[in-house]
Amino acid sequence: MKLVIIVAASNLIAPFASSEEIALGNTHAPVTLIEYGSLTCSNCIKFHKYVLPRVKKHYIDEGTVRFIYRHFPTSDAAVHGAVAAQCAGKSYYEMLDALYSTVADWYKAENKNSIFAKQAAALGLNSEAFLSCLSDAKYLEDVVSQQNAARKDYDVTGTPTFVINGKIVRGNKSFVEMKTLINEAIN
């Protein structure tokens, strides 16, 4: 009977966070913080500018939190940015940082791919391979699939939405609020 319960519980955890996802922090951290965000969402931009660096310093770098960013684009521009982040591969989080900090430069740009390619080159990525990736439909499908899974698994309808050790938290959060939520998850 215990084996059945363990197997059933592991099936519930599976969609929560895969060890294969590109993440910041220790894979075995006691807290997993997932953000469903959109690169053009003003509250997501604020989170990445003001809150995430502090969460990283106090929790991720200390091995207490594993952070995973999943795309939930709320505009066509955010879809393009999400694909660019996916195409950055192991430089995924560096590209997310670049995209969030330069959203005003690419949000309404006619040729977003040109801007994304410059950002990729600045990260040391192969520009030709990166541009080829941007036109690969697989990455767009991955972004759409991530968004559909978010709707199905966590009833995500807007951004930012956070999942902290399985607990769904919606809306903009300050560092103090995030700290409280993380500490609750630790205890």
Regions found by a protein language model. Name each.
Residues L24-T27, T32-E35, Q86, Y107, ...:
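Short N-terminal micro-motifs specific to bacterial/archaeal maturation
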Residues K2-S75, E141-K152, N183-N187:
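Extracytoplasmic thiol/disulfide redox context detector
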Residues H28-P30, G81, G158-T159:
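A structure-centric signal for secondary-structure junctions around beta-strands
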